[in-house]
Curated annotation (Swiss-Prot):
Coiled coil location: none
Cited function: Bifunctional serine/threonine kinase and phosphorylase involved in the regulation of the phosphoenolpyruvate synthase (PEPS) by catalyzing its phosphorylation/dephosphorylation.
InterPro entries: Kinase-pyrophosphorylase, PSRP
UniProt-listed PANTHER family: PYRUVATE, PHOSPHATE DIKINASE REGULATORY PROTEIN 1, CHLOROPLASTIC
Protein name, entry field: Putative phosphoenolpyruvate synthase regulatory protein
EC number: 2.7.11.33, 2.7.4.28
One annotated GO molecular function: ATP binding
One Pfam family from the record: Kinase-PPPase
Binding positions for ADP per the UniProt entry: 153-160
Organism of provenance: Xylella fastidiosa (strain M12)
Catalytic activity, reaction form: [pyruvate, water dikinase] + ADP = [pyruvate, water dikinase]-phosphate + AMP + H(+); [pyruvate, water dikinase]-phosphate + phosphate + H(+) = [pyruvate, water dikinase] + diphosphate
Family statement: Belongs to the pyruvate, phosphate/water dikinase regulatory protein family. PSRP subfamily.
Alphabetically ordered keywords of this record: Kinase, Nucleotide-binding, Serine/threonine-protein kinase, Transferase
Enzyme class: transferase
Amino acid sequence: MSTIRPVFYVSDGTGITAETIGHSLLTQFSGFTFVTERMVFIDDAEKARDASQRILAASERYRVRPIVVNSCVNPYLSVILAESGALMLDVFAPFIGLLEHELNTSRHSRVGRAHGMVDFETYHRRINAMNFALAHDDGVAASYDEAEVVLVAVSRAGKTPTCIYLALHYGIRAANYPLIDEDLNSDQLPLRLRPYRKKLFGLTINPERLQQIRQERRPNSRYAALDTCKREVAAAERMFSAERITTLSTTHTSIEEISSKVLVTLGLQREMF
């Protein structure tokens, strides 16, 4: 059996739902090379037939049955896609019938509900949170009064991506503060952070992994040297311990997991967008 499998994320909208669920499923299987392709805005029969032909062509090219992760809400489009002979994984079908029975009503299919601008107020909050994260990145803001969380870590430990994820997916006003040499000379929190102790969450990282990341940014620099990374990480961890700041290692932790831990630790109740 071939270890190369073509995978198509097919959607009548942005494809975010299909790709997110599909990626989560595929990561459960090792030993395979998944060649993925996104097919988005497949919202009529003509587009569905074209997609089906492309999937069929992949079957012939790779000589193996493709996998289709489908989030199209129109069942007719799903039927057309199935003509490709691919393994069809419909992300809604297993649950819609159960929910219709439980709620005693039929679904109202609408493209883009999962990630569209269905609720303007919610969408506006998300955009504001994103702008906040960008304006409060890397300690550039003078105050964290409006922040709901302030991530603290040495440079390149995952602060910015996590803040952006919290903003986009939860509407959280997330700021971050980079620990510099001046801060790391003491086991006490920097003066700027002390008024916001209850909002702080520390990120740490394996020095070897940090060195790899920094090497990509500034090759062969003092900034990327392993001894620099070891010194900074050790100093940051001493500070977090002394100040009793909750921490999490980002070395083998996804942004999704980091964000969930932050929300739980700080008691931030917010539905995912």
